[in-house]
Amino acid sequence: MEKLGTINISYHAIATIAFQSALESYGVVGLANENFARGLSRFFSKEPTSGVIVHEDESGISVDLYVIIEYGTRISSVAESVSHSVKFNIESMTGIPVKAVNVHVRGLRVSDMD
């Protein structure tokens, strides 16, 4: 196959895939800004890269996710599911190897019992 040029995938695009994959995972109710001290006004952000940091080196990419999990779910199971989902979706959509997905649980959301 003749090579016609290069393909560049931005960190923003990769972060958006990671963000959406995490939000679609059972038990995740939102992503928090990585710098939690920025205040509660950005606690549940809908910005498609908030709470996601992408790092790249010669061996692939790593992703840090800062998630809010639903109270009552098994935190370790939710985090593991998020990790697998994010890795699978990034690799299948971009073809870029993901060497690590680090899930940081920033808080729990307690649902109203009404």
Where are the regions that the model predicts?
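Contiguous, often N-terminal, cationic amphipathic patches that form binding interfaces
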Residues: 1-71, 80, 96-108, 112-114
